């Protein structure tokens, strides 16, 4: 007997019972995005490897350890996208969308990182992100945060997430801070783990988000980035905080929040939760005003965020189980039995779909008695059953049963659509 082939570790199948929940959540996310004026963009899953090396940074964990990179048949190095901000910027430059223009886009799709699989962290994961190009004020940063806050309210998780904010300033400000931080770390090398020692010179800001408790204790005495901010970055951050205060959005300033990708500047933010254990970040983003120029475009201010869909769905399931409890596949189930009923049922089903194109109507196939077919209707979550037997076929009628109340009546087929609207409204 042949050995079963299974999914690659860390890459998951999402079955119909799962995708019902995904679709319900995605519908809310997309509706809110449309309400803020965002349009969808779709970019390739595979990009040239230099795109990510230049955008994310050569000495980041993503580039050094986590990318799925290989040579294609022409010997060109290509990479499965580990994130999609770089792809959106590349597409914007390539198609002339960014110069002297304002763009608001969103994307949703699979990303790939070679990480140790665990709850909420996978090697193939779905990410929804939003990017804004051409706007540089703190007001657009605030709007992005307000957009995400609206998601949390609609999903019933707002009270279980916390907004963390920081400003990492300009490139020059970070260079000055980096020099001070390295000098501090050099004095305390004996208290650093090997990973932090490696990062101390290559990417010292990443030491700030070390998960090592001893390192975190040491950092209590380290220089703080806020003391090195340039005047414009400080004004921008103060403006953002004032806007959020005015909008009633609570936040916590986290001086050690730096984000793991090199392209960020000024505003960085994360929505975090304690409800999922170690994997606490739900959504994260910030400004990346230099990235467009870095990838070959003209200087263009930009800001955005990304959110892991699997982690969001885990959080909604944990906090708001009622939201994901309903798994209705069909509104109406068409049961048929007896001679001639199958053909009549096919015709009736198409007529109803023509009249009510938004209706979810599932037709019984495979026979079965009346009781068994109604059992299938219940399993699919149907509220109404249409019953078509030999008598109904001969008379041109249909029995319609409200599965919630048990009430049943027989009507001419021409009146069925109107009655369904009444019962389901």
Swiss-Prot record:
Transmembrane segments: none annotated. One of its GO terms (cellular component) is cytoplasm. GO terms for biological process: histidyl-tRNA aminoacylation. InterPro entries: aa-tRNA-synth_II (IPR006195), aa-tRNA-synth_II/BPL/LPL (IPR045864), Anticodon-bd (IPR004154), Anticodon-bd_dom_sf (IPR036621), His-tRNA-ligase (IPR015807), HisRS-like_core (IPR041715), HisRS/HisZ (IPR004516), HisRS_anticodon (IPR033656). It catalyses: tRNA(His) + L-histidine + ATP = L-histidyl-tRNA(His) + AMP + diphosphate + H(+). It is an enzyme of class 6 (ligase). This is Histidine--tRNA ligase. Signal peptide: none annotated. It comes from Photorhabdus laumondii subsp. laumondii (strain DSM 15139 / CIP 105565 / TT01). One of its GO terms (molecular function) is histidine-tRNA ligase activity. The lineage of its organism: Bacteria, Pseudomonadati, Pseudomonadota, Gammaproteobacteria, Enterobacterales. Disulfide bonds: none annotated. Its EC number is 6.1.1.21.
């Amino acid at each position: 007997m042949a050995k079963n082939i299974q999914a690659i570790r860390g890459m998951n199948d999402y079955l119909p019972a799962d995708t019902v929940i995904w679709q319900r959540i995605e519908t809310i996310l997309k509706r809110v995005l449309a309400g803020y004026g965002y349009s969808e963009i779709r970019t390739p899953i595979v990009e040239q490897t230099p795109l990510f090396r230049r955008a994310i940074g050569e000495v980041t964990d993503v580039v050094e350890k986590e990318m799925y990179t290989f040579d294609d048949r022409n010997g060109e190095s290509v990479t499965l996208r580990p994130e999609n901000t770089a792809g959106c910027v590349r597409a914007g430059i390539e198609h002339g969308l960014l110069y002297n223009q304002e763009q608001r886009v969103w994307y949703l799709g699979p990303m790939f990182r070679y990480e140790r699989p665990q709850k909420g962290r996978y090697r193939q994961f779905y990410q929804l992100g939003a990017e804004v190009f051409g706007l540089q004020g703190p007001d657009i940063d605030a709007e992005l945060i307000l957009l995400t806050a609206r998601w949390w309210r609609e999903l019933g998780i707002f009270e279980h997430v916390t907004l963390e904010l920081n400003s990492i300033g300009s490139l020059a400000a970070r260079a000055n801070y980096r020099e001070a931080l390295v000098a501090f770390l050099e004095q305390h090398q004996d208290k650093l783990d090997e990973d932090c020692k490696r990062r101390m010179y290559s990417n010292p800001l990443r030491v700030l988000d070390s998960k090592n408790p001893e390192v975190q204790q040491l950092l209590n005495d380290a220089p703080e980035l806020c003391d090195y901010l340039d005047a414009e970055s400080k004004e921008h951050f103060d403006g953002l905080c004032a806007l959020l205060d005015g909008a009633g959005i609570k936040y916590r300033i986290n001086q050690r929040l730096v984000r793991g990708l090199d392209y960020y500047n000024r505003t960085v933010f994360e929505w975090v939760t304690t409800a999922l254990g170690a994997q606490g970040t739900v959504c994260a983003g910030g400004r990346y005003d230099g990235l467009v120029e870095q990838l070959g475009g003209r200087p263009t201010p930009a800001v955005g965020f990304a959110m892991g869909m699997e982690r969001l769905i885990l959080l909604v399931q944990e906090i708001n189980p009622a939201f994901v409890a309903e798994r209705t596949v069909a509104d109406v189930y068409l049961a048929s039995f007896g001679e001639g009923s199958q053909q009549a049922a096919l015709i009736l089903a198409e007529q109803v779909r023509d009249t009510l194109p938004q209706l979810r109507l599932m037709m019984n196939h495979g026979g079965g008695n009346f009781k068994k077919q109604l059992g299938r209707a219940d399993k699919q979550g149907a509220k109404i059953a249409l019953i078509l037997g030999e008598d109904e076929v001969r008379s041109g009628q249909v029995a319609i049963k409200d599965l919630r109340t048990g009430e049943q009546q027989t009507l001419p087929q021409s009146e069925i659509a109107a009655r369904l609207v009444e019962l389901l409204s």
